[in-house]
Design a protein with these regions (language model features):
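Divalent metal-binding segments
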Residues: 2-11, 15, 19-280, 295, ...
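A generic structural signal for residues embedded in beta-strands
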Residues: 36-37, 111, 516-519, 548
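His/Asp/Glu-enriched, well-ordered alpha-helical/loop segment
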Residues: 205, 340-353, 357-383, 387-388, ...
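Short alpha-helical functional segments enriched in proximate histidine and acidic residues
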Residues: 99, 213, 497-498, 539, ...
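C-terminal accessory region downstream of the catalytic core in glycan-modifying enzymes
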Residues: 14-16, 533, 537-548
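Acidic (Asp/Glu)-rich catalytic clusters
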Residues: 246-248, 282-292, 378, 399-401
């Protein structure tokens, strides 16, 4: 070792995620990198005296948690919105009324997190008018794939009397044709046109406040699942909020940013370059550094299971969700357009993250990736399918053969699992959020939450990946449960692999980034029902203690 370590961690139970050395008790850090791992602290430190020594007294040290699908700015913004995770419409309306009473007339009332499978129905514009007179009201669904607004908003949009047709979305209406206030998928862009873009200062604050929560939960890296446009982006210059947060010392965790496909446009590059679409200057996946980097292009192919808008090959079970007993959901754009966009982004050198929840949409994504590889061969493009929620067994095998990474959310089981089980019906329960099938097929499994759709604490995610129970206690496709070791690997090395960053993070090995999460106990050694209750003692990023629960 050429110089003394900055930090030496000793008396630790180190779970390295390195098959060559699964466990250790000491780790040395210098210059933000791991420089030694082993069981002899003196040897790990290279015989030198470390500047700081941290005695972990038997606590468990793991690679820092990495959430592979997380809406960081969306979560930061949600912290100032009404929490609508309630079990009845009466409670929802009461919370809206309380916020309205405390808000100056004319200001927006914004809430998030309601689930009609728990409240019994979607909120209605007329009820919102009564509880929040004089305010524009915008309530976001738990899935983020739909929202409800009141009459003032509908009037601003010029659609308070009749519902327009929206490509890739729907403005719901009652039997008389009058809009109810419910807006699905791309119809939400109409509301966004009234409220966005948000000021960069507000978005920068959202990055910072979200990061503070993440540190408390042991997160050291996130993949932001869509910036720059469409119904999910907050501003066309959203990346600048992350840059500003970093310049101000308020980017607390490492961030990889997916760029939404709406931000892509035709580029007049030289024909030999093969770059037909992209973002300006030819920036693409991989641009940046270990703190802030451009990730894949994010493209939405369909919607959500909770909202019954995901594109399925057969109709939804029970309540169709939109009055159509043959409802199979829908794609968010023409299939040919979606396919060509994926192929063009692949050709231009981007990794692609295709949101595909229903098995019909998954077929489209797999077909597009197959066509892209055939037309424009690339070595290990490592494309992704976000969610891969209702996947047939043949689709598991095909994803494995294509080298596509399905990025699921085990965390969904507890918070919204009951609603998804009801949506697909018993015959398709075995399709839901596969884990065991993917691992058995040789696919690398990442860990992610889709926060703020659900509470994104990684330990809760690991708990759900192992236990697979809904809020009501029902099994959530229990045959797809995995072990604590496998779930922990997913939230560390697996997520790094999904970001094509396993060479710099995801395991405790010499040369890798010094990002660690320190836990009160070993998640692989406690009973499965105790995983959620473990404590994050400290979070270390870049070799520095960024969070210490014990001062």
């Amino acid at each position: 070792m050429p110089y003394a370590p900055d930090l030496l961690l000793v008396n630790a139970n180190v779970l390295t995620m390195d098959p060559a050395r699964p466990r250790a008790s000491a780790v040395a850090v210098a210059g933000g990198r791991i420089v030694g791992v082993g069981d002899n602290a003196a040897e790990v430190a290279g015989g030198a005296r470390a500047r700081d020594v941290l005695d972990l007294k038997g606590a468990t040290l793991i690679p820092g948690f990495h959430d592979a699908h997380n809406h960081m700015i969306g979560f930061g913004l949600s912290l100032t919105e009404i929490d609508l995770r309630v079990d009845s419409l009466d409670e929802l309306y009461a919370r809206v009324a309380a916020r309205a009473a405390a808000t100056p007339a004319g200001e927006w009332i914004i809430g998030a997190g309601y689930d009609q499978t728990k409240t019994g129905a979607h909120p209605h514009r007329d009820a919102l008018d009564r509880v929040a007179p004089g305010h524009r009201v915008w309530l976001k669904h738990a899935s983020s794939h739909m929202c409800v607004v009141n009459s003032l908003v509908l009037r601003d949009l010029g659609i308070d009397v009749t519902a327009p047709q929206v490509d890739g979305g729907r403005v719901a209406a009652d039997a008389s044709g009058r809009p109810t206030g419910l807006m699905e998928e791309r119809a939400q862009e109409l509301v966004g046109d009234l409220t966005r873009p948000y000021p960069l200062a507000r978005l920068t604050d959202a990055v910072a406040t979200a990061g503070e929560t993440y540190l408390r939960e042991g997160l050291t890296s996130v993949t932001e699942a869509g910036v720059g446009g469409g119904w999910i982006g907050q501003s066309p210059v959203e990346l600048a909020a992350y840059v500003a947060a970093r310049e101000q010392g308020r980017l607390h965790v490492r961030a990889e940013l997916m760029v939404i496909s709406d931000a892509f446009h035709a580029l007049t590059a030289h024909p030999s370059d093969g770059i037909e679409i992209g973002i300006d200057l030819g920036l693409r996946t991989g641009f940046g550094d270990d703190w802030l980097r451009l990730g894949p292009m994010k493209i939405f192919t369909d919607g959500s299971l909770l909202g019954r808008t995901a594109a399925m090959s057969a109709p939804y079970d029970g309540d169709p969700g939109n009055g159509d007993s043959n409802n199979k959901g829908y794609l968010q754009a023409d299939a040919g357009h979606l396919t060509q966009t994926i192929i063009a982004a692949h050709q231009a050198g981007w990794r692609v993250a295709a949101h595909a929840i229903g098995d019909g949409a998954i077929d489209l994504a797999l077909d597009a990736f197959d066509a892209a590889a055939s037309k424009h061969p690339r070595r290990d493009p490592r494309h992704r399918i976000e969610h891969f929620a209702a996947a047939r067994q043949d689709q598991v095998a095909r994803a494995a053969a294509l080298g596509v990474i399905p990025v699921g959310q085990g965390r969904f089981a507890t918070e919204i699992g009951d609603g998804m089980l009801a949506a697909v019906g018993p015959d398709r329960h075995p399709w839901l959020y596969r884990q065991r099938s993917l691992l058995d097929a040789g696919v690398v499994l990442p860990g992610s939450s889709d926060r703020p759709v659900v509470t994104g604490t990684p330990l809760l995610g690991i708990h759900d990946m192992v236990n697979r129970r809904t809020a009501s206690g029902a099994p959530f496709n229990a045959g797809e449960a995995i072990t604590a070791e496998e779930a922990l690997r997913a939230y560390t090395w697996g997520s790094a692999y999904a970001s094509k960053a396993e060479h710099v993070k995801g395991s405790v090995e010499a040369g890798k980034l010094a990002d660690f999460t320190i836990l009160s106990e070993d998640p692989t050694a406690v009973s499965p029902d105790r995983i959620a209750g473990l404590e994050v003692i400290a979070t270390i990023v870049d070799g520095e203690v960024r969070y210490d629960a014990r001062g």
